[in-house]
Amino acid sequence: MKAKELREKSVEELNTELLNLLREQFNLRMQAASGQLQQSHLLKQVRRDVARVKTLLTEKAGA
């Protein structure tokens, strides 16, 4: 997900997106732990998306 797309969203939408990403991250970690994860690059991708959303939430809180 691009930061430009995220900047257009409201705080409520960002919180919803963050919750969805954290759920996805949990599911991916469980798959990795059980050896079922085929696409390991998704772990890194979701982790960075979570960081992007958290950064934008912090920016919007300060503004």
UniProtKB/Swiss-Prot annotation:
Gene3D superfamilies associated with the record: 6.10.140.1970
Family annotation (InterPro entries): Ribosomal_protein_uL29, Ribosomal_uL29, Ribosomal_uL29_CS, Ribosomal_uL29_sf
Keywords: Ribonucleoprotein, Ribosomal protein
GO biological process: translation
Annotated signal peptide: none
GO CC annotation terms, alphabetical: cytosolic large ribosomal subunit
The keyword Ribonucleoprotein is assigned to this record: yes
SS bond partners: none
Zinc listed as a keyword: no
MF terms in GO: structural constituent of ribosome
Family membership: Belongs to the universal ribosomal protein uL29 family.
Name of the protein in question: Large ribosomal subunit protein uL29
